[in-house]
C-alpha cells in the first residue's frame, strides 16, 4: 500500500528535502518514539523527511506518531511482513530526499547529527557512502557493553584515509544517485546482515564508506542481557545466508582471528579509557563467542 502522511500540516513546506531518514519497524513502536524525539532536535539543521516502514507489525502505528508531522514531514507505509531488506527498499521507493539516511528504531540521533552529516557530504561531492559514528547508552550494563564494542570496532576498522571497513545501517547514509532507479539497494535474500552484504558490494567496487565521527547516533538497546543473548542466537543463524552469498562472490569481509584478538585487546584497554569497568568486556566477548559458536554450528550442519 502507498505511503500516506499520517497528518498533513500546511505549515510544512512540501519541497524536496536534503535527507530522507528511513526507519523499518517491526513491533518496535515504543523504541521508535525515542528515535522520533531525537529527530525533532534536528529541525534547525538541513531539511529532511522521515519515512517509517511498518514491516507487518502486530499493531499499526500508534496515534502518538501522528503528532510528529507537525514538527517534521513523516510518512508511514505498511507492508506484509517481508523482512528488513525489503522494508528498507520500500522506504527508498517511498522517499524523495537527495540523500538516504538509514537508522534503526532503537537509535537516537545526537544533537547536530544531520548538520554534521550534511557538512561532510557537501565537502565531499565525489563520495557517495557515509558511515555515521555509533555509540552505546552507558546507563546500564548492556548499554556499556555496546558502547565498548562500538568504540573498539570503529577504531580498529577506521583507515588512515578516513574510510572505514564497516557499514551499519543503524547510522548509514548514501546518495540517491548511487541507488538503482528501482530502489532495491538491499538484497531481499538477506534476512539479517543485509548491511554487511551491502558492504561486500562496496568493497568489490572499491568504495568504502567515509567515516563521519561528528555525526553521532546512539544505539539505545531496550533488551535485557538474556534477551540480547536470545537475539544473538537468532541473528547468527540467519546471518549465515548473507555470509554464504559474500563468500560465493569471493569477497573477504569477515573478521579473521587476528582481527578478533586485536579488537578484544583494544576493548580491554578502552574499559579504562572510557571508564566503563571490566564487566562489559566479559559481556561483549561472551556474546561474540556465542554468535561464533552458532555460526560454526550452522556451517557444520549445512
Residue ranges, per PLM feature:
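Short, well-formed alpha-helical segments that are part of the catalytic scaffolds
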Residues: 5, 28-41
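Acidic donor-binding segment of Leloir-type glycosyltransferases
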Residues: 36-78
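Glycine-rich, basic loop-to-helix element that forms the pyrophosphate-binding segment
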Residues: 79-95
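Short aromatic/hydrophobic "clamp" motif used to bind/position activated sugar donors
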Residues: 100
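Conserved donor NDP-sugar-binding/catalytic core segment of glycosyltransferases
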Residues: 112-143
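Short, flexible, basic/aromatic active-site loop/helix in glycosyltransferases
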Residues: 132-133, 146-165
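Acidic donor-binding loop at a coil-to-helix junction in glycosyltransferase catalytic cores
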Residues: 191-200
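Non-catalytic, C-terminal membrane-associated alpha-helical segments of glycosyltransferases
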Residues: 231-237, 251-302
Amino acid at each position: 500500500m502507498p505511503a500516506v502522511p499520517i497528518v498533513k500540516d500546511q505549515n510544512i513546506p512540501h519541497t524536496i528535502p536534503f535527507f530522507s531518514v528511513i526507519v523499518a519497524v517491526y513491533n518496535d513502536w515504543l523504541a521508535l518514539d525515542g528515535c522520533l524525539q531525537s529527530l525533532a532536535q534536528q529541525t534547525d539543521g538541513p531539511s529532511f523527511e522521515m519515512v517509517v516502514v511498518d514491516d507487518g507489525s502486530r499493531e499499526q502505528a500508534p496515534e502518538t506518531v501522528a503528532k510528529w508531522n507537525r514538527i517534521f514531514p513523516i510518512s508511514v507505509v505498511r507492508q506484509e511482513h517481508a523482512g528488513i531488506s525489503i522494508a528498507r527498499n520500500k522506504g527508498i521507493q517511498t522517499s524523495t530526499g537527495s540523500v538516504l539516511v538509514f537508522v534503526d528504531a532503537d537509535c537516537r540521533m545526537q544533537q547536530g547529527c544531520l548538520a554534521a552529516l550534511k557538512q561532510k557530504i557537501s565537502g565531499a561531492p565525489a563520495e557517495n557512502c557515509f558511515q555515521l559514528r555509533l555509540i552505546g547508552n552507558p546507563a546500564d550494563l548492556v548499554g556499556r557493553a555496546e558502547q565498548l564494542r562500538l568504540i573498539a570496532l570503529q577504531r580498529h576498522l577506521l583507515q588512515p584515509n578516513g574510510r572505514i571497513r564497516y557499514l551499519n545501517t543503524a547510522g548509514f547514509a548514501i546518495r540517491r544517485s548511487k541507488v538503482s532507479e528501482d530502489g532495491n539497494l538491499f538484497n531481499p535474500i538477506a534476512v539479517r546482515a543485509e548491511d554487511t552484504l551491502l558492504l561486500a558490494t562496496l568493497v568489490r567496487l572499491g568504495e568504502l564508506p567515509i567515516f563521519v565521527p561528528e555525526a553521532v547516533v546512539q544505539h539505545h538497546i531496550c533488551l535485557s542481557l538474556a534477551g540480547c543473548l536470545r537475539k544473538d542466537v537468532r541473528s547468527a543463524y540467519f546471518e549465515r545466508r548473507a555470509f554464504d552469498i559474500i563468500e560465493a562472490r569471493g569477497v573477504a569481509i569477515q573478521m579473521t582471528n587476528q582481527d578478533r584478538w586485536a579488537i578484544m585487546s583494544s576493548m580491554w584497554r578502552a574499559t579504562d579509557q572510557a571508564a566503563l569497568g571490566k564487566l562489559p568486556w566479559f559481556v561483549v566477548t561472551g556474546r561474540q563467542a556465542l554468535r561464533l559458536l552458532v555460526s560454526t554450528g550452522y556451517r557444520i550442519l549445512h
